[in-house]
Amino acid sequence: VGGYHICPRDQHGLTGPCAPSHDKGKDKMRKFLTGITTAAMLMGSAAYAETTLKLVEVITSPERTKVLQGIVDGYEAANPDVTVEIISLPWGQAFEKLATMVAGGDIPDVVEMPDTWQALYAGSGQLASLTDHVADWEHGATLTEKTVAMGSQAGDLYMIPYGFYLRAMFYNKNLLAEAGVEPPETMADFMAASAAVSELEGKSGYCLRGGPGGTNGWVMMAAAMNGTNDFFTDDGKSRMNEPGSVEGIQFMLDLYQKGYAPKDAVSWGFNEIVAGFYSGTCAFLDQDPDALIAISERMPAEDFAVIPMPVGPSGKAFPTIGFAGWSIFKATAHEDKAFDLVAALSAPEANGTWAKRVGVIPVHKGADQDPYFQTEQFEGWFKELNGEQYEPTTMPTYLEKWGYFASTVVLETSQEALLGQRSAQDLADEWAEFLTDEHAKWQAKQ
């Protein structure tokens, strides 16, 4: 027909194979049709994997990347039309590298967002609101209230936190039993228990962090005794030298100067306080869940437990909290698919896996019912997350010189005070003056 022959049908009525034709026109047409078919198949395949999402992780380690890749692999298997490209930035350079990417237009769809960066990116309008997405998400209602509060800025949700680094109190059961005291619930109990343990030969009550990274301890004690974790008054003045805060600073000085902490603790950092606890040198240690890794390797589980931070005269405690989570950049061309990825990363099962492997407290209601978390070692953190008398404290990292204050000013001046060279009031006044000035500079830029 028209220069082309029709092949005979087989017994099923289908066109059967034809003998090769020596007609050049037919060969050209066959090649043409084959080319069209191949192109169509390739186009169809491309359309099937049509979306690539760029995910940037910033708190990078081999273990974290391995866990993240495993969750992403499961997401890709369930969503064959989406490919996820993971970009791992080393933590020490992550802030600058992400800022450079964003400024250059190489903006990721999904980003691991530390708490200290959230105000910067959300405040400048660069993050997509997740409020409506979470409202429609099957697991949205199981996020704890503190999780939603921590991921929000100005009433909008810009991050789904994946876990918390929350400060709570480790205690050595054997030392408390030997000293004849119960786990402390109040600041007064804590001082009395520390004194009792310190009566034991070669033992101290508290693993005080007088060296690098000790700012959290001073802030928590000051807040507990002052009854508030607000850093500033409405008119911008630091609360650090209010009478209650001065009492909290004096509380820390008393622990050391009365001999309820080891003498060497004036220079102890993270490794030293953790070692001081698992070696049985001191009975109390305030730390985050990631300290469990080293402690659990060296102490039997039945020898220690974790309780909430002791409450002050107001009946409240203000444990410091750190967290990170998943955010979506507003510039993404695939917001719905990006949220599907965030939802997969944040689902209860995935979040539970992440929390166990990374060393954070999970974010969903009922997570404490997982047998892994139903231990005395995790009890204190879940009580803090679920109890109204515990208000997590976030540092004012929006202040330009907060890093300098925490790492240098507090370190140097508090060591002088611990050694008896300065008073609590003197310390509080210097800190308050510094913070009030920094707050004024920040306020002027708003």
Regions found by a protein language model. Give the residues of each.
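Glycine-centered hinge/linker elements that transmit conformational signals in sensory
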Residues: 194-196, 237-265
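Conserved C-terminal helix/tail region of periplasmic/extracytoplasmic solute-binding proteins
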Residues: 52, 83, 177, 391-446
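Short, well-ordered beta-strand elements
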Residues: 50-62, 82-87, 109-110, 158, ...
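Short, solvent-exposed loop/beta-turn-alpha elements that line the ligand-binding surface or hinge
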Residues: 128-143, 210-213, 227-247, 296-299, ...
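Hinge/lid segment of periplasmic solute-binding proteins
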Residues: 115-168, 182, 191, 199, ...
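Extracytoplasmic "Venus flytrap"/periplasmic binding protein-like
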Residues: 70, 74-143, 152, 174, ...
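Extracytoplasmic "Venus flytrap"
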Residues: 53-70, 89, 165, 213-214, ...
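C-terminal lobe and pocket-closing loops
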Residues: 119, 288-301, 312-412, 440-446
